[in-house]
Regions:
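Membrane-proximal, proline-rich intrinsically disordered regions
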Residues: 29-80, 84-91, 98, 109, ...
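Short capping/connector residues at structural and topological boundaries
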Residues: 37-40, 149-151, 245, 295, ...
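C-terminal functional modules
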Residues: 389, 393-509
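Short acidic (Asp/Glu) and glycine-rich catalytic loops that position anionic groups and cofactors
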Residues: 30-33, 341, 399-404
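Structured, solvent-exposed acidic/aromatic patches
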Residues: 45-48, 75-129, 133-394, 415-419, ...
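Bacterial Sec-dependent N-terminal signal peptides
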Residues: 1-37
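Residues in and immediately flanking transmembrane alpha helices
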Residues: 23-24, 300, 453
């Protein structure tokens, strides 16, 4: 992979934007290195150009991560080939590390340029994106370069120390503090240039920042008492009010704003199917999201004659290379995610999800269930379910429901005073939500002390190689040992190892 000197720092912070402006693309570490050394490159790039490229690249990375990793690790989908995720034979997944740090280069430089120009709103929006990308990295790997990745001092530029996950999330200048600062900045003057997410709407950026704060607080709630801080945000800060506030990137269908899965060959795209567990959950609820998440097994027949009922099934998580008992014949992913012959809407309709109103509502439902806030858990839960169904354009008529009220009252999707009723609907709503669907499943699994039976909507993958234990993290990329050896090996000592079962701070209960 690329030798990006572990991180994208001051000298190369704006390389992604420069390449985009030149009509080039990220192809190799050698190309990046040669550009980094170009003495004729401009010393200043417009913050809006940097921000556009940082948002686009980070969201597109998130889409790809969810397709290959998050959906599968959370058991919403299953790999039918090269099933290392489902069989629990995890590695570094270096693209997650490399591409996220590359995106951070543009985002951090946009933040710096905006701060120097006194553009508070631009700086605030960049902080939101920076916090989101760093949260993905630390929740995937554990301890990572953070403080020195931000400062970009001469030594740290090439050999950044690893911060502990606790410091990254909760410390001074940590993610929670940065998001709080972002909210304050977004209340001030300036403008958000190059904003392909919210078209310069600072109020929407504030709502996203506050929703992210709730998400992070929930992730660390087994390590710290976060109830008061969570309640204070709910009581006094602006939050998402509907799907109109969703943190999503809409693609145009044309390069470079093309949904990242569209260029795949169909055979490669079809190596992922809806999972047995997701199919079972949707089928038992008679849930119309089935028709969005999955493509019918008899798609060609249904396409020719829509009166013929569509049929669906799921593929098992696990490996057929170990045991033939793993069924890999599930329905492939739906038309919304790929331009199948005769169905080319993915190019212009697919979106990259950072965070949705539905997820926020499930966070509020869980907080109410826990007694952190005085709101009604069932109301927030129903709002989350409805928001997810509406986002995916649910057609209740296709499944026999009169409307949402009929569905929520009679399908079994409603809140039944149990935490699992919230968990299951949140899980179904987080399809293609980066790696956060896996982070949530990992949190629930840890809360239940690794007892799969206490999470009835998922299960240990068949023929897995890890003793039915859900992996806790991705391994550090192998080239870290040669690029940043002292800090890399020190991080492994502090973390207690570099295996898929090493417990990072948030899950070390």
């Amino acid at each position: 992979m690329q030798t990006f000197k572990t991180l994208t720092m001051k000298k190369s912070l704006f390389i992604g934007a420069l390449i985009a402006m030149a009509g080039l693309s990220f192809q190799s570490c050698e190309k990046l290195s040669s550009i980094n050394e170009n003495p004729n490159e401009p010393s200043n790039v417009d913050a809006g150009v940097l921000f556009t490229e940082g948002v686009r690249s980070s969201v597109s990375t998130s889409v790809t991560q969810s397709y290959l990793l998050g959906n599968v690790a959370s058991q919403l989908a299953a790999k039918t080939l090269r099933a290392v995720i489902g069989e629990y034979s995890w590695n570094a997944f270096p693209n997650t590390w490399n591409q996220n740090y590359a995106s951070l280069g543009n985002i951090i430089e946009a933040e710096r340029v905006a701060a120097e120009a006194g553009n508070a709103q631009m700086e605030g929006a960049a902080k939101v994106m920076k916090s989101w990308v760093f949260s993905t990295l630390t929740l995937a790997y554990g301890d990572i370069p953070y403080t020195e990745a931000i400062t970009g001092s001469t030594d740290a530029e090439w050999f950044p120390a690893y911060d502990t996950q606790e410091e990254i999330i909760t410390g001074t200048n940590g993610l929670l503090e940065e998001l709080a600062r972002a909210v304050q900045l977004l209340d001030n003057g300036g403008s958000i240039q190059g904003d392909i997410l919210f078209n310069g709407d600072a109020a929407k950026w504030k709502k996203l920042a506050n929703a992210m704060r709730l998400r992070l607080l929930m992730y660390i709630s087994e390590k710290q008492n976060v109830s008061a801080e969570f309640a204070a945000i709910v009581a006094s800060e602006s939050l998402m009010e509907s799907n109109a506030d969703n943190g999503i990137l809409t693609y145009t269908g044309n390069f470079p704003n093309e949904y990242p899965l569209v260029p795949l060959k169909q055979g490669d795209f079809d190596a992922v199917a809806i999972s047995t567990n997701a199919h079972a959950a949707l089928d038992s609820l008679n849930d119309p999201r089935m028709y969005v998440y999955a493509r019918p097994n008899n798609a060609s027949t249904v396409f020719a004659d829509p009166s013929i009922p569509a049929t669906y099934d799921g593929a098992d998580n696990g490996s057929t290379a170990i045991s033939a008992s793993c069924d890999k014949n599930g329905s492939r992913l739906g038309y919304a995610y790929y331009n199948y012959p005769g169905h080319d809407q993915a190019g212009t309709m697919a979106e990259g999800i950072i965070m949705t109103y539905a997820e926020q509502q499930f966070l509020l439902a869980e907080a109410a269930h826990n007694g952190w806030i005085t709101d009604d858990a069932g109301t927030h839960h129903a709002s989350g379910v409805q928001a997810s169904l509406e986002y995916y354009g649910a057609d209740f008529g296709m499944t026999g429901w009169t409307d949402f009220a009929d569905y929520i009252a009679n399908s079994g999707a409603g809140y039944d005073n149990s935490i699992n009723s919230i968990r299951e609907q949140k899980w179904l709503a987080m399809f293609f939500t980066g790696l956060d669907n896996y982070f949530e499943v990992r949190r629930w699994y840890t809360q239940e002390s690794g007892n799969w039976a206490n999470l009835p909507f998922i299960s240990a993958p068949c023929s897995n190689t890890n003793g039915d234990v859900l992996p806790m993290r991705f391994l550090y990329p192998g080239n870290e040992a040669s690029l940043n050896p002292d800090n890399y090996f020190n991080a492994i000592v502090v973390m207690g190892g570099n295996t898929q079962n090493t417990k990072m701070w948030v899950v070390d209960l």
